[in-house]
Amino acid sequence: MLKVLLVGSGAREHAIAEALCGAPDEDVELYAFMGNRNPGIIRLAEDYVVGDPTDVEAVARAAADWNVDFAVVGPEDPLAEGVADRLEEEGIPTFGPKRGPARIEWDKGFARELMEKYDIPGRPEFGIFEDPDEACDFIDELGKPVAVKPAGLTGGKGVKVVGDQLKNLDEAKEYVKEIFEEDIGGIPKVIIEEKCVGEEYTIQAYTDGEKVIPTPAVQDHPHAYEGDKGPITGGMGSYSCPDGLLPFITKEDYERSVEILERTVEAIKKETGEPYRGVLYGQFMLTAEGPVVIEFNCRYGDPEAMNILPIAEGDIVTLHASIAEGSMEGEIEFLEKATVCKYVVPEGYPESSEGEGDVIEVDEECIHRYDAVPYYASVNLDEDGKIRMTSSRALAIVGIGDELEQAEEAAESAIRECVSGERIRHRSDIGKHETVEKRVRRMKRIRGE
C-alpha cells in the first residue's frame, strides 16, 4: 500500500486521483490538499485538507503528518512557488518539477531564451522586454501581427493576439502598457512574438529528466463560446483520436513535436542543473513550416489530462512514483479510443460571477450509461451534500468511443441528459465532425494542399 499526497482540486486532479486509485499495479491510499471541496476527490481520499495549495509550508506539514510515500502536484502555481523543493526537503519524492525546471512555464521569457540558447527548433521570431517603450518599438519594427504575452502565470488567460483579442498593432501596444501598469503575470517583463498561423495542439510527455514517454495528441478549445468566439478561458474542452494523432497532424508532425519535447527536457537539465520530473506539456501550432512551440507547461493540461488518463493502461502508480524518485519505470499504453472532453461552466464564465453559488446536479450513473466519465472541477461539496459552483469551470464530462463521433455523442448526451443547473452552459461544438473538418480544411489551405 502506497500513501500518495495529491495537491490540487480541479477536474485534472480528480482525473489523476481516479487513475491512481483505479490502477491495477499498486494499491493506493490517497491524501489530498485541496483549494476547494471537490466531491470526486473527497470520495476517493482517506483524508484531506482544504487550504491554499501555494502555501508550501502548509502542504509540507500535511504531507509529513500523513507520512506519505510520494506526492503528485496538479496545478502550476504550487510548482512555481517551490512546493516540490519543499516536499523533497521533507524526504517526500514529488511528481512535478522543482521551481527551477518549472520555470519553463512560470517565466515565458526563460522558455524562449532556453530554446534559442540550445537551438531547439519550433521558435517564432520574438523579443523579450522589461521596458514597455522598447516592446512597442519592436512591434513597430516587426510591422506584422503579433502575440503579446505577459512573462508570468496568468491561468492561461494572459496571451492576446492581433486578429483575435486585439484588433491591430495599436491595441497590441496598449496591452503592453497594461501588462506593466497592472503587473499582469507578476513578472515585469513582456514577450512579443510574430503571430503564427495554423492549428494548435498539445502533446504531454512523462519524463524523469532523462527518458521521455509521449502521450496522444490533444486539441484544446480555449475560446468561451461556440465557433471559437469570445474571450480565452482555461479551456472549454478538448478531443483526442484513436490513433494518437489528430485529423490535421501527420506522424512526422507528431514525431517532430516529440523531438522538441525531448530536447527541451535535456536543455532544462543542462541549464538549471535539476532534472525535470513530471509531465512536460508542449502547446504547439502546426504551421506551413511545421510545428512551432506556443508555450510549455510544467504539469498535466487541464482539460488535456482528461483525454489521456481515462484511456491509460498499465503501471500508472509505478510510473508516477518512479518519476518522483527520479528513475522512470513501468509500462504505460493508451487504448485506441477517441475521447471528447466538454466542460460545464457557470453562465458568466469567464467574465462575470453569474451562476456562482448555484447548485449543479450530476447523475453519475446516468453519465456512465452513456460511456462517459465525470470529473468535478471548481465546485464545493456543501455540508448538506449539495454541489455548488464557483465562478470557474464546474464539471468536465469525457465521452469515450471507438471513433470521434461516438465519443462526442457520449459527452454531449451525458451533459444534456444527466447534468442540470439553472445557469450553466457548455460548448456543444467541441469534437463535432463539422468543427474538426473546418480545422482540417484550414490546415490544408495553409499547407497549400
Swiss-Prot record:
Keywords: ATP-binding, Ligase, Magnesium, Manganese, Metal-binding, Nucleotide-binding, Purine biosynthesis. Binds 2 magnesium or manganese ions per subunit. PROSITE patterns: ATP_GRASP. Mn(2+) 2 binds at E295, N297. Mg(2+) 1 binds at Q283, E295. Mn(2+) 1 binds at Q283, E295. Mg(2+) 2 binds at E295, N297. Its cofactor is Mg(2+); Mn(2+). Its EC number is 6.3.4.13. GO terms for biological process: 'de novo' IMP biosynthetic process; purine nucleobase biosynthetic process. Residues 112-325 form the ATP-grasp domain. Pathway: Purine metabolism; IMP biosynthesis via de novo pathway; N(1)-(5-phospho-D-ribosyl)glycinamide from 5-phospho-alpha-D-ribose 1-diphosphate: step 2/2. Belongs to the GARS family. This is Phosphoribosylamine--glycine ligase.
